[in-house]
């Protein structure tokens, strides 16, 4: 029969662990809400920028404009920007991004294309350093809710690589937020920008709410405004110069939104993992408590038998 003190200590240990996982779940839930607020806060700027670029596109037609960020070159080297986290305890979030990156690298190699890695997050850095992969730049210890200045620093690095023709294309691998229990690693081409113009598709903004004491996600369709400038509007500067200045800003905005979605995905994965850990801890406590009660009952029964046996011997 298990030792009573051992079982009692084990129960206390599991209870302490459950307190930690429950606290981590609540912290992650609060940070998911903050990530949502950041996405909403950047929407007015993103909408206005999309509107300006959309109208400039109609005025100029990108196919007739020669701009560095629109230049299509023969693809010899690709910069792959990989977004992971610095910490674990978030389910398969980091592993899924790394797995998708390995698949993309395999695809590039099969096409005879070289690649350079730009890594965000300690998990990606540790993984690819162990495999001696060609790492161009590493970024760790970013804010849990990425800021515009952090996105700008990374964006400048990518622009430098592309404009210097060190790489001919820039791809981004990040985790798209789908729900609190679902996310998907995706590959997106950042550079060069499409020559057919800038898309303004319907976007989905997620909102974390509580219903019946549980966290749920509401999704809202948001469309960027595309109302036109007056046709007789005169630009003080050459529209091409305006476009040349706004495209890097657009790239930075796209990168910021991808970083924010990745952060939300990581926090949601951590919240789900900690919720599952708390539930498992509760079940383990029940099992250990049952074992403890059985052992205690057996010990009491044994003592009674010994007392009765001693009395009979007298």
Swiss-Prot record:
<keyword id="KW-0472">Membrane</keyword>
<comment type="function">
    <text>Produces ATP from ADP in the presence of a proton gradient across the membrane. The gamma chain is believed to be important in regulating ATPase activity and the flow of protons through the CF(0) complex.</text>
</comment>
<dbReference type="GO" id="GO:0046933">
    <property type="term" value="F:proton-transporting ATP synthase activity, rotational mechanism"/>
</dbReference>
<keyword id="KW-0813">Transport</keyword>
<dbReference type="GO" id="GO:0005524">
    <property type="term" value="F:ATP binding"/>
</dbReference>
<protein>
    <recommendedName>
        <fullName>ATP synthase gamma chain</fullName>
    </recommendedName>
</protein>
<keyword id="KW-0406">Ion transport</keyword>
<keyword id="KW-0793">Thylakoid</keyword>
<dbReference type="GO" id="GO:0031676">
    <property type="term" value="C:plasma membrane-derived thylakoid membrane"/>
</dbReference>
<dbReference type="InterPro" id="IPR000131">
    <property type="entry name" value="ATP_synth_F1_gsu"/>
</dbReference>
<keyword id="KW-0375">Hydrogen ion transport</keyword>
<keyword id="KW-0139">CF(1)</keyword>
<dbReference type="InterPro" id="IPR035968">
    <property type="entry name" value="ATP_synth_F1_ATPase_gsu"/>
</dbReference>
<dbReference type="Pfam" id="PF00231">
    <property type="entry name" value="ATP-synt"/>
</dbReference>
<keyword id="KW-0066">ATP synthesis</keyword>
<dbReference type="GO" id="GO:0045259">
    <property type="term" value="C:proton-transporting ATP synthase complex"/>
</dbReference>
<comment type="subunit">
    <text>F-type ATPases have 2 components, CF(1) - the catalytic core - and CF(0) - the membrane proton channel. CF(1) has five subunits: alpha(3), beta(3), gamma(1), delta(1), epsilon(1). CF(0) has three main subunits: a, b and c.</text>
</comment>
<comment type="similarity">
    <text>Belongs to the ATPase gamma chain family.</text>
</comment>
<dbReference type="InterPro" id="IPR023632">
    <property type="entry name" value="ATP_synth_F1_gsu_CS"/>
</dbReference>
């Amino acid at each position: 029969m298990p030792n009573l003190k051992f079982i009692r200590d084990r129960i206390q240990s599991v209870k302490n662990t459950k307190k930690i996982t429950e606290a981590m779940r609540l912290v992650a839930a609060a940070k998911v809400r903050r990530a949502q607020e950041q996405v909403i806060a950047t929407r007015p700027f993103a909408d206005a920028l999309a509107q300006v670029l959309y109208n400039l596109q109609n005025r100029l037609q990108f196919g007739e404009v020669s701009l560095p960020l629109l230049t299509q070159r023969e693809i010899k080297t690709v910069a792959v920007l990989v977004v992971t986290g610095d910490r674990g305890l978030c389910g398969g979030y980091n592993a899924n991004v790394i797995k998708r990156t390995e698949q993309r690298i395999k695809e590039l190699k099969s096409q005879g294309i070289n690649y350079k890695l730009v890594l965000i997050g300690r998990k990606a850095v540790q993984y690819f350093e162990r495999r001696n992969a060609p790492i161009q730049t590493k970024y760790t210890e970013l804010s849990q809710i990425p800021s515009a200045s952090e996105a700008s620093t990374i964006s400048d690095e990518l622009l430098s690589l592309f404009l210097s023709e060190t790489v001919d294309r820039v791809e981004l691998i990040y985790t798209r937020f789908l729900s609190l229990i679902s996310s998907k690693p995706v590959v997106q081409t950042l550079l060069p920008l499409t020559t057919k113009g800038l898309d303004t598709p319907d976007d989905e903004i997620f909102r974390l709410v509580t219903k019946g004491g549980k966290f749920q996600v509401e999704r809202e369709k948001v469309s960027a405004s595309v109302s036109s400038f007056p046709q007789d509007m005169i630009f003080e500067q050459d529209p091409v110069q305006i476009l040349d200045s706004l495209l890097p800003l657009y790239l930075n905005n796209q990168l910021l939104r991808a970083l924010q979605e990745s952060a939300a995905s990581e926090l949601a994965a951590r919240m789900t993992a900690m919720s599952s850990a708390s539930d498992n801890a509760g079940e383990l406590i029940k099992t250990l408590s049952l074992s403890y009660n059985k052992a205690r009952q057996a010990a009491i029964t044994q003592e009674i038998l010994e007392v009765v046996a001693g009395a009979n011997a007298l």
